[in-house]
Amino acid sequence: MALAKRIIPCLDVDNGRVVKGVKFENIRDAGDPVEIARRYDEQGADEITFLDITASVDGRDTTLHTVERMASQVFIPLTVGGGVRTVQDIRNLLNAGADKVSINTAAVFNPEFVGEAAQHFGSQCIVVAIDAKKVSGPGETPRWEIFTHGGRKPTGLDAVEWAKKMEGLGAGEILLTSMDQDGMKNGFDLGVTRAISDALGIPVIASGGVGNLQHLADGILEGHASAVLAASIFHFGEYTVQEAKAYMSKRGIVMR
C-alpha cells in the first residue's frame, strides 16, 4: 500500500510575527503564528512548518518562546527552520517543542553538521532544506543548482547529487523549494521534484509555486513527492486544508 501523503502549511515568521500576509476570516490578529497554526491544526493539516526569517540574534529568544507557545496549543508535528547552525540550536528548538528541525545554509557550508545532528538526535528529527534553481538551457540535460541566501548565491552544487549526499549523512527528509517557482503560483517545478524524489529513499517535501489544488496533487502524482507544502493558498483563505485533502483523495491520492 502506498504511504499516505501529507499537506503542510508553512509560516514565515519574523520576530515572532507571520510575515507573508494571512487573511483568514475570524482571526483577530493575522500576525500571530500560534493562532494561525491552531487554525491549520483544526482544519486537519498533517504538520506545520515554521520558518524563522529573523536575522537578529535577539529574535532567536522570541522564536523559542513562539515555538513553546505553538507546541503547547498545536498537536501535529512541528518543523522549525531558519538560522540553525549548531547542535545547541537544534537542542534548544527540540526542547522548546519542535518535532523536527530544518537545516539549510549551514548544511552547505558544513555538510558534516547534518551527520552530527542526525547522530545526536536521530534522522527522524533532521530535515535538510534545499533551494534549487534550474541552470540548464533549452535542449540541455536538465540540471538544477543549490543556491543560498534566499536564492541569491549560487554554490556550484548539483541539487540531485547534493540531496543524495544529505541522505547519506543522515537527513530524514528533504524540504525542496524551487527558487524559479517560489511565489509564482503556477505550480511546483515537477522536473526537479521528480528527479530528487526518485533518487532518494527518504521523503521529499515539495515547496514553491502552489497556486491551486491541482498543483498540490501534481506535486505528488507527477513530482513523486511524499508531502506538499504551501503558504499563500491557505493563508489567504482561497482554500482550506480540508478542501485540499478532499480534492487529493478524489484524485486517488491516499491522504493521512
UniProtKB/Swiss-Prot annotation:
It is found in: Cytoplasm. One of its GO terms (cellular component) is cytoplasm. Keywords: Amino-acid biosynthesis, Cytoplasm, Histidine biosynthesis, Lyase. Its EC number is 4.3.2.10. The active site is at D12, D131. It catalyses: 5-[(5-phospho-1-deoxy-D-ribulos-1-ylimino)methylamino]-1-(5-phospho-beta-D-ribosyl)imidazole-4-carboxamide + L-glutamine = D-erythro-1-(imidazol-4-yl)glycerol 3-phosphate + 5-amino-1-(5-phospho-beta-D-ribosyl)imidazole-4-carboxamide + L-glutamate + H(+). GO terms for molecular function: imidazoleglycerol-phosphate synthase activity; lyase activity. GO terms for biological process: L-histidine biosynthetic process. Its main location: cytoplasm. Gene3D superfamilies: Aldolase class I (3.20.20.70). Pathway: Amino-acid biosynthesis; L-histidine biosynthesis; L-histidine from 5-phospho-alpha-D-ribose 1-diphosphate: step 5/9. PANTHER family: IMIDAZOLE GLYCEROL PHOSPHATE SYNTHASE HISHF, IMIDAZOLE GLYCEROL PHOSPHATE SYNTHASE SUBUNIT HISF/H IGP SYNTHASE SUBUNIT HISF/H. Heterodimer of HisH and HisF. Belongs to the HisA/HisF family. IGPS catalyzes the conversion of PRFAR and glutamine to IGP, AICAR and glutamate. The HisF subunit catalyzes the cyclization activity that produces IGP and AICAR from PRFAR using the ammonia provided by the HisH subunit. HAMAP family: HisF (MF_01013). This is Imidazole glycerol phosphate synthase subunit HisF. It comes from Pseudomonas fluorescens (strain Pf0-1). The gene is hisF.
